[in-house]
């Protein structure tokens, strides 16, 4: 005989331990919660001490506002907080913590001691102690400077099952250090100290000046990150994105150097990850992950941070706006990375340049006279634009290279790829025009990639610059140039497939779809039309594809439509069609670019260098491999022990 179990209220001690299972996973979780409380208290200096990776001891000390004596017992109670008092406060919360669960959860699985003082006199401090399931905290006087100290000993001492899941001391400290890194990157105006087993691991000074910020980023992520990163600062539509994004050539095998903050809170969000992945799509080597430290600032009322137990996920009121802002900002910044004539301090290395960082930098450069080599290139490009419409740029580019050395026309550039692109776009072929190579000028400012001096094994171009030697992979560089010209012809300036020739299907493709997919297809009809796809609703669970772009060829239309609908539902946009078309253009550009063992004349090599300087994303080929590298005179001198 079975008995029905009656519903009852959980014992407070059991409820706290259940909550601890969500909040307290390992020592790093404790550090995160305690430090966030210290930040919310207005601290200017935070010290963290650990023993045995945090399993034996965690101490967090701050110089914040402190907690009143009367509030100390409440601080260890569930759902007790000073940070919000109403639903309106929750909807616009700007503090890191607000649920009032952290200290109660931590104290239920450890021996916790909290000492705090709200006055400047050290003798005015008070201590409250809680141990495991002991729910009657004891408050006693204790000297302490203004601020608070939280000491957590013997984590999971009363839950052996949880304690045995802890890893080695080194592993647990690694997780704590990563949590510290994220917290220290969130607030540059706070000084930080991290000690492990009484040894200082990190000591960071407070400072919100740009140099202080870069110094902290370099200390936490390494100088190599800063040397291979772009600083961005972009503001639009009530959103501001600033921080550092790594160059495509500075990537990692794991996504372990990706830090994204929303209003000072570190988050891991699918929408953000998708936007960043899209921005790097054309320039990142397959299987690699970008590195970045980015900060998004927006009105707290348009973002919900109360959607995850550890607050790692957020929900934006207008996810499509945020996604498009992130994508367009990063896409533009990465597209503008090109060889720059200025060098880093010491003159040893060339630095990438982008006009997407700040408006003041762009305005400052606008008033400066362009060097002669750049004026000539711009004049040539402008003249070609007046003579021919933009739809002919692919053929114009390829014809220009053939005109440089007509006796090698067949081996330099085969016409098939460009003709395929023109056929897809529905444009006639213009007559060929020459693009004369840039001759060496008398200007004191040489072009960033210098002037070609030789070709090595028919593969690499050797160029002399003001700083030293540049080596260019001519096939990879030409592949990127050709690819960008093809994309420009097909997509145009707005990345919309408006010029793309479409074809009606002789037999419409019937697609079985869910009710949600049908609803998305109806709502996004204009989006599909803009992409050259005619998609009709034929029934409550059926879609019909009547027209697709010509370039899709024999693609799996049904799978593509399902993927696009999924993206539109989750992220508010889909780039599946563009990706598929760009893959075809990339393959065409690869086969249509100058091959290894093709001997180029010096004018041809210089023409290629000038085109690299004018082409977006020319630092990487279509597959994400670097197209050029540089060795400074200092590096060359070191090889031969000159000046030793």
From Swiss-Prot:
Record's keyword terms, sorted: DNA damage, DNA repair
Matches recorded under PROSITE patterns: DNA_MISMATCH_REPAIR_1
Name this polypeptide is given: DNA mismatch repair protein MutL
UniProt-listed SMART domains: DNA_mis_repair, MutL_C
Domain of life of the source: Bacteria
Role description: This protein is involved in the repair of mismatches in DNA. It is required for dam-dependent methyl-directed DNA mismatch repair. May act as a 'molecular matchmaker', a protein that promotes the formation of a stable complex between two or more DNA-binding proteins in an ATP-dependent manner without itself being part of a final effector complex.
Family, similarity comment: Belongs to the DNA mismatch repair MutL/HexB family.
Region described as Disordered: 338-390, 416-445
Cellular component aspect of the GO annotation: mismatch repair complex
Species: Chromohalobacter salexigens (strain ATCC BAA-138 / DSM 3043 / CIP 106854 / NCIMB 13768 / 1H11)
